[in-house]
Amino acid sequence: MKVHFVTHGCKANQYDTEKFRQELEARGATPVDDPLEADAAVVNTCTVTNNADRQARKAIRKLKRDNPDLEIIVAGCSAALRFDEYQGMEQVSGVVEGHDAVQVAGLIAPEAPLLDRDEEPIGGELLERNVRGTRGWMKIQDGCDRRCSFCATKVARGASRSRSEDEIVDEARRLADAHSEIVFTGIHIGHYGHDLDGGKHEHSLSRLIARLLEEVPDVRFRLGSIEAT
């Protein structure tokens, strides 16, 4: 099974696509850059604007037009908010409401074994590597507690949820074996840790950075999306 990946939107979505890729590779799938060579495609959508939704639908139609035999799976933020709309598109084979890599892979390779994974609130296994470039993406947080009237991210991604420090450090060590720079991703990483320890605020972004600099010293760390995006 050859799978092509299309990612729209933010760095957090890029990280989620890497999760999809890793899960499918574990099930025997082969990622391909050319959609004409693919048996299936995963479109990871964005919904930050109406134009983002239109671009996702346009991409889906083009994929199917260029490769009529392609099985198309739609996931991501737009899919979370517009499940029925994508489900109703004749070009679409399946829809996942959000970013669950197991669900995405299950629609393409349902009979293959799953990866072992931790039960983390943002639902992600550890990435071993990112497939492109010297930078590795590492999501430390997902969701947002803000209620901005112009933004659908809160609805699409849910409340702010932080990964544990131990898991982040473990993933950073793995990524450091293949990358010289690691980029923190999330929706509002400045809010990291506020939901841990029952809201006692014993965890924070600054504390996490200090620990990473001490325990994973041979890699650069870059911050993105400190405020809600």
Set out the residue ranges of the language-model regions.
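Proteins enriched for Cys/Gly/acidic motifs involved in redox and nucleic-acid/cofactor modification
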Residues: M1-G193, S204
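Conserved radical SAM core fold
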Residues: H188-G193, V219-R220, A228-T229
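Alpha-helix-loop-beta-strand connector modules within alpha/beta enzyme cores
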Residues: G199-R220
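Short aromatic-enriched loop/helix-cap "lid" or pocket-rim segments at secondary-structure transitions
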Residues: L196
